[in-house]
């Protein structure tokens, strides 16, 4: 089924899309950048760089991270980080709703079937 992909280009080299939002949601749910990275099958370094890029994209940080210690470190989303997720998901829902008729038309016309096999062209 065709799916809408929403990406906001905030500035050159700074974008916000489903990958970064997914990472923020995992950090929110798991309380750790490391755990979020593992859950998303990416390196800790990659996750850290994505979060650093997000923090540089806005006037306020999206994550508040603490370094390890006796009980290890952790990360929590800032109030602004939670707002970023909320606004992105709201925009995504609004966009999907507004183009749903067109997406259904593409779905009906698509030659890609449920198993992902492309029908032969004549």
Where are these regions (language model features)?
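Residue cluster at the C-terminal edge of the helix-turn-helix DNA-binding motif
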Residues: 56-61
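Central "turn" residue of the DNA-binding helix-turn-helix
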Residues: 41-43
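C-terminal regulatory/oligomerization modules of transcriptional regulators
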Residues: 101-122
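Residues within the DNA-recognition helix of helix-turn-helix
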Residues: 50
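Basic, amphipathic "hinge/linker" alpha-helix immediately C-terminal to the N-terminal HTH DNA-binding motif
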Residues: 65-91
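Alpha-helical linker/hinge and terminal dimerization helices associated
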Residues: 84-106
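Short, Lys/Arg-enriched N-terminal segment that forms or immediately precedes the first helix
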Residues: 1-12
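Short helix-boundary/capping micro-motifs
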Residues: 27-37
């Amino acid at each position: 089924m065709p799916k809408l992909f929403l990406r906001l280009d905030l500035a050159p080299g700074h974008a916000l899309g489903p990958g970064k939002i997914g990472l923020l949601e995992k950090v929110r749910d798991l309380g750790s950048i490391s755990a979020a990275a593992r859950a998303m099958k990416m390196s800790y370094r990659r996750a850290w760089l994505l979060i650093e890029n997000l923090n540089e994209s806005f006037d306020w940080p999206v994550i508040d991270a603490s370094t390890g210690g006796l009980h290890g470190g952790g990360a929590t989303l800032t109030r602004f980080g939670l707002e970023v997720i909320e606004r992105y998901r709201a925009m995504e829902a609004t966009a999907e709703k507004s183009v749903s008729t067109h997406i259904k038309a593409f779905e009906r016309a698509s030659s890609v079937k449920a198993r992902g096999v492309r029908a032969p062209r004549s």
